[in-house]
Each structure stands twice: as C-alpha cells, then as structure tokens.
C-alpha cells in the first residue's frame, strides 16, 4: 500500500513529535498538498501545537499561511545573503481555524502591513529570475 501525500505529511509530523525535541523545524511542509488537504494539515498542526506546546520554526513563502499559523512572522530579504527585514507579532485569537481566521479583519490588517514591506523584496526576486 502507498500513502497519499497528506498521509505522508501526517506521518512526518508524528515522527517529529515522537522525537520530543523542544524545537520543531518545518520547511514548507504543506507546499505540495492540494488546498483542502493543506488546510486540514494546518489545523492538525495548530491542534497538536496547542497540545504539545513546542516551539515551531515554520518556513513558508505563503504569507497567508504564515499569518494563519504563527504568533510571530519574521520576513527575510530576497537573495542568497538573506537578512531579517521585518518582525511582526501576530495577535489573533487562539484557538484558530486556518480558513476562518483569514476572514478576520485583524488578519487582513496584518496581511496589508507585512505585504507593504514584503512586496519590494518579491519584485527584486522576480526581476533577478527574469534577468537569467
């Protein structure tokens, strides 16, 4: 039998929790999933986080995902010599549902604030790839 992409992600998340380290590093863990499975996995992560209370370092290129999941979003500059260009507290109520929180006016305000600073970096990265 083969596991679906979503089930493989669940197994990987369970393996990370079993190791029982204080820090859980997740580098774009849901990027290959369809939207519906992705939202289920994001809600699973939030539920498990609230239960186990580990520190999670979650790397993503998806600003909405970052805001929906995080208590803090750190934005890096584009390019190989990336540096921190922004650090934003996410003060949205918990527990959260990742689909519902996106409809919150506070979510949209946070998104606009971060996007104002991030947009220039996105354009720089895009221009670099076009120049190749």
Report each predicted region and the residues it spans.
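Conserved signature/switch motifs of ABC ATPase nucleotide-binding domains
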Residues: 1, 19
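ABC ATPase nucleotide-binding domain "signature motif"
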Residues: 4-10
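Catalytic Walker B motif of ABC-type/P-loop ATPase nucleotide-binding domains
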Residues: 24-27
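Helical segment within the ABC ATPase nucleotide-binding domain
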Residues: 38-53
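Conserved H-loop
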Residues: 53-59
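Conserved catalytic segment of ABC-fold P-loop ATPases
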Residues: 68-75
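Conserved beta-strand-loop-alpha-helix hinge in the C-terminal portion
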Residues: 78-111
């Amino acid at each position: 039998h083969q596991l679906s992409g979503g089930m493989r992600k669940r197994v990987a998340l369970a393996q990370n929790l079993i190791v029982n380290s204080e820090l859980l590093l997740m580098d774009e863990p849901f990027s290959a999933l369809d939207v519906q499975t992705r939202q289920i996995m994001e809600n699973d992560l939030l539920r498990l986080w609230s239960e186990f209370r580990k520190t999670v370092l979650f790397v993503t290129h998806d600003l909405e995902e970052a805001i929906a999941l995080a208590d803090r979003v750190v934005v890096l500059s584009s390019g190989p010599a990336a540096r921190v260009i922004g650090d934003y507290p996410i003060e949205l109520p918990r527990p959260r549902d990742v689909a519902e929180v996106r409809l919150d006016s506070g979510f949209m305000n946070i998104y606009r604030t971060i996007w104002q600073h991030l947009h220039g970096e996105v354009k720089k990265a895009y221009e670099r790839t076009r120049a190749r």
